[in-house]
């Protein structure tokens, strides 16, 4: 069974491109959200395996969103166009399973970060 993914970003263009990229890589994108509140609701309704959360949502902090949605069955990966070095301590202190630069985003990179092969 393919990994179920929720994308959280305030850029409609990025959401569209990321969905296409991940689906080509065999992931099932079950939904998208552009705000923290939408993300919380979608996680509750869709129960994805992994949620990709942009660090810089419009007026919201991706770290705060990660705190609200991380759970036993849902892994969170933080994403950004900024380098990990800019946020390394915050990422390490967050409930997120890791960080991916948006330019490195792929189904394979997500599977590797989560230690999954499906």
Residue ranges and their predicted role:
Residues 62, 91-98:
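As written
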Residues 12-31:
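Two-component/phosphorelay signaling modules centered on CheY-like receiver
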Residues 79-80, 102:
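Hydrophobic/aromatic residues positioned on beta-strands within the core alpha/beta folds
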Residues 35-38, 61-64:
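Acidic catalytic/metal-coordinating carboxylates
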Residues 32, 58:
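The feature encodes the CheY-like receiver
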Residues 86, 103-114, 118:
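C-terminal output helix
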Residues 8-9, 33, 51:
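Conserved sequence signature across two-component system core domains
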Residues 54:
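Active-site residues of response regulator receiver
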């Amino acid at each position: 069974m393919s990994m179920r993914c929720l994308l959280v970003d305030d850029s409609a263009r990025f959401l569209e491109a990321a969905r296409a990229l991940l689906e080509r890589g065999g992931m099932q994108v079950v939904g998208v959200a552009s705000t923290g509140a939408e993300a919380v609701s979608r996680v509750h309704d869709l129960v994805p395996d992994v949620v990709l959360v942009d660090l810089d949502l419009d007026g919201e902090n991706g770290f705060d969103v990660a705190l609200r949605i991380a759970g036993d069955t849902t892994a969170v990966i933080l994403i950004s166009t900024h380098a990990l070095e800019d946020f390394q301590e915050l990422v390490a202190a967050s409930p997120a399973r890791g960080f991916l630069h948006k330019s490195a985003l792929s189904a394979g990179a997500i599977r590797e970060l989560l230690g999954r092969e499906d």
